[in-house]
Regions:
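C-terminal accessory helical subdomains adjacent to catalytic cores in phosphodiester-
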Residues: 1-5, 16-46, 54-176
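MIDAS-like acidic motif and immediate structural context at the N-terminus
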Residues: 7-12
C-alpha cells in the first residue's frame, strides 16, 4: 500500500518557502521509502484561498488512487497562526480553518506565529522570506531545530504540531 501526503501550504508556487521547511523537517526527523510514500504540495498563494484549493486536492487524490486501489491519500493543511492571541480576526480564522479540516477529514498543522518564527526563531519580512528559506536549506539549519519546538500539543509561540501530525503515518514515516 502506498501513501500520498498532500500538503496544502500558504506560500505561492514560485517561492515554495513553506515547503522548504516542511520537506527539511520530514527528511531530518523521519525515515521513509520513496517508493511507498508520495509527497505532494498544493500552494494556496495566501491563507485566505484555502477553500479554492479543494479541486486541486481532489485531482491529486484521484490521480493517486487510479495508480492502485491500495493507495491512500491524506491531506494536511498548514497554516500560520499569525496574531491569534491579540487579533480576533486571526483567532476566528484559525477556528474556521480547524472546522474546515475536521469537516473534510484533513489534518491540521499550525505554525505559531508563522513558519519562519518556528524554524528561524524570528519574524521575517515578506521581502526576505525567500532568501531566508534558501539560507535555511543551504546551511542545513534544520539540524539546529529541536524536536520539542515541532511537537507542540497546543498553540504557543515559536511552536508547531507538525511532528505530532506526521507521527500518525507509521509505518510510512518512522522517526529517526
Amino acid at each position: 500500500m502506498g501513501l500520498q501526503l498532500v500538503f496544502v501550504v500558504e506560500a505561492n508556487k514560485k517561492s515554495k518557502t513553506d515547503w522548504i521547511y516542511i520537506k527539511d523537517t520530514i527528511d531530518r526527523f523521519y525515515k521513509y521509502e520513496a517508493a511507498h510514500l508520495k509527497l505532494s504540495t498544493v500552494y494556496m498563494d495566501g491563507k485566505n484561498k484555502y477553500l479554492s484549493k479543494k479541486k486541486e486536492v481532489n485531482l491529486l487524490l484521484s490521480q493517486y488512487s487510479v495508480a492502485s486501489t491500495n493507495n491512500v491519500t491524506k491531506v494536511i493543511y498548514c497554516f500560520d497562526c499569525d496574531d491569534y492571541d491579540s487579533n480576533p480576526v486571526d483567532k476566528e480564522f484559525l477556528e474556521k480553518t480547524q472546522e474546515f479540516c475536521k469537516a473534510n477529514d484533513y489534518e491540521y498543522v499550525w505554525f505559531c506565529k508563522d513558519v519562519e518564527r518556528v524554524y528561524l526563531g524570528k519574524k521575517v519580512e515578506d521581502g526576505h522570506k525567500n532568501s531566508e528559506a534558501t539560507r535555511f536549506k543551504a546551511n542545513k539549519l534544520i539540524n539546529g531545530v529541536s524536536q520539542s519546538r515541532l511537537n507542540g500539543k497546543s498553540i504557543s509561540h515559536n511552536m508547531s504540531n507538525i511532528l505530532s501530525v506526521l507521527d500518525k503515518y507509521k509505518p510510512h514515516l518512522v522517526r529517526k
